[in-house]
Amino acid sequence: MKKIIVIGCPGSGKTTFAEKLRDRTGLPLYYLDAIWHKPDRTHISREEYDERLSEILACDSYIIDGNYSRTLEERLKACDTVFLFDLPLEVCLEGAISRLGKARYDVPWIDTELDPDFRREIEGFGEKNLPRIYELLRKHKDGKRIVIFKSRKEADGFIEGLE
């Protein structure tokens, strides 16, 4: 467990889990949102993002937090461990709302309200994204440890079980 990706619906607890995993393992943590977004709410080019992601994937160890479906298959091919947060919609919406007004490491600004487009992304994640994620997990399962969390309690239990 040295090349880890943490994926799942926004608001599901991915980042909190990734930070706890980093603290427990000492592995470097990379936030895809922090790579993609600039402080002015614009983003870097796809080429620059791809270059930075390739540099991370070439490392001996990492934890990568985030979805970015365009590059998910590349990350799945490179990693040895996947943590998927497949939590109920209500939990994810509550998670996204609970972080409003708070500074975060993964985005360079503070949201004070839930953006309607972001809310739609969360609401559509189960129908739009999860089927493809599960398909890619089946395709790239060989030689990988895949852990699927259905609750934050399961994720916390996993962290507590690490030595």
Kindly label every feature range from the protein language model.
Residues 12:
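ATP-binding Walker
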Residues 87-132:
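A glycine- and Lys/Arg-enriched "phosphate-lid" helix/loop adjacent to the NTP-binding pocket
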Residues 28-82:
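Conserved nucleotide-sensing/catalytic segment adjacent to the nucleotide-binding pocket
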Residues 9:
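P-loop (Walker A) phosphate-binding loop of NTP-binding proteins
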Residues 15:
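Walker A/P-loop
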Residues 6:
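Hydrophobic anchor at the beta1->P-loop junction of P-loop NTPases
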